[in-house]
Amino acid sequence: MRIRRNDFGVLTPPELGTWEPTMTVTVVIPAHDCQETLDLTLAALSAQTYPSHLLDVIVVDDGSDPPIEAAGEIVRVRESWGRAAAVQAGLEAATGEVVLVLDADMVPHPEHVEAHLRWHHLAPYLVVLGWIDFTQPPSPPTPAEVAAGVRDLFPMSSHRHDWAEEIIGEHDGLRSAPSSLVSRVHVGATASYPAWLLRACGGMDASLKLAEDTELGYRLTQAGAVFVPDPEARAWHLGLPTAMRSVAELKRYNDPFVADRVPYRRYLRADQGRQWLVPYVDAVVEAGSYEDVRASVDGLLAGSLPDVRVTITGPWEWLTDSRRSPLADPLLDLRLLHAQFTHDPRVRLADPPPGVAPFRLICPPGWMPGHDSVERLVERLEETDGGVLCVALAETPDGVVTARLERTAALSRAALVIRPGEVLDDVLDEVFGVEWVDGADFGFTRRPRLYPPRRRPVPEHERLARQREQELSRLRERAAALRAEVTQLRREAAKGRRDTARWKEKAEQWRREAVRLARERNHTVLTRAVRRVRSLTFPDR
């Protein structure tokens, strides 16, 4: 069965209690100084609906004092300590086709193992996550009470894995979650894995004392796993975990370890110029002409994304110190590349790297990515959650010259499901998606004819930065001139307002004077008219 990205909705698990299991499962329980809760965990496992002849349990005693006691198989960790080391010891001893890791403070419902295993019968690369209900009982039940019935034994706590349930709910039960997010819900308190897949990706990192689930979830993603949370695989968690009791302290402890190992947590890698144990992008350049390879590597290392490691592949074992003509050496280009990059910690002279980084960029020698080319390509692939970006660089008589940005999770998934005779890119397109883009649109250019140039050309990002600075300077000058002009206009406007007020006052004076004069004139005219009338009427007077 082929699953696209994390969309396990193409699978239809059987209803609980209606199917016939065939796969074997080993339940691994890491335990440290927790005999009382472990007894309840084991009692709940004794009452599982999954066939007992297909289920075995391994308790791993992580240095308990007094030592843990249990009826079944016990593995005691002596050379290391911590939960990761305990789970790894249990994995090494496990014989089941599936390994279900269950913490010693978990009390699973009777259908818990069955709910996990019904998925594993459908596809061989699923990681199934149980559903946790927290409880803080005033007094724990006895193992006999647990074996008799788990579902209603405990009062439900108000605490939940809100952040995980929110991610699951917002992404259609995790089916539409992007690759960079999906493994965040990997909580190892109840999780099951194909044993072969867990071993193939390296098992637990025993050097980690906390955050081991986060780191393992990341590596499982790169191995091509599909994560399936099943709300019917329920279990009680007795008490609150450290993640809920000491949030700030746990984050402070985990951040540097997670930052070094999980490139997806970009917010933890905000430090400029830092290098990390696991790079964000593994770039691969095949050895060839010294000038071509150097130009490509220089472009990759000078990019805006510093979280890049470059591997130059070639027959490095051919380089010996036997006598030769230095200038006529048939391996001269290879030797020059070795001399140029052997002491650069960001460059490896080796075979192609294993799939640990989330992205791999294959760049043909002689082609130089621009300052932000790699960063923009990764952003494009993350936006679409695609599997491969094929970057068309040039067309030649031999075909199209391309660079490729590949998602490691997509390559691993395709390798798991490809059939003989199939074309890899066809399978990649089916399980994640393949997209073609124009290299010129992403800043790829052919190297200069002379490389390295005697005078280094100004990098594009510096040229653009200077251009922007010049434009800003011009705009600042223009803004200053406009401010001065506005100030002058304000002054003139204020003067205009004063003049207007003065002229209004004069106009009012003139109006009053005109009224007065008009009245006087009218009075004079009237007086004359009266006199004229009188003289005409009374001529003798």
Can you say where each PLM-predicted feature lies in the sequence?
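N-proximal low-complexity "stem/linker" segments adjacent to membrane-targeting elements
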Residues: 1-44, 255-291
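Short, acidic, metal-binding catalytic loop of nucleotide-sugar glycosyltransferases
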Residues: 43-54, 298-307
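A conserved acidic beta->alpha catalytic loop
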Residues: 61-68, 106, 314-329
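Glycine-rich, basic loop-to-helix element that forms the pyrophosphate-binding segment
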Residues: 77-94, 115, 340-352
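Conserved donor NDP-sugar-binding/catalytic core segment of glycosyltransferases
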Residues: 111-160, 368-403
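A recurrent flexible, glycine/aromatic-enriched loop bordering the glycosyltransferase active site
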Residues: 156-192, 387-388, 396-403, 407-430
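Boundary detector for helix-to-coil junctions that initiate low-complexity/charged tails
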Residues: 452-541
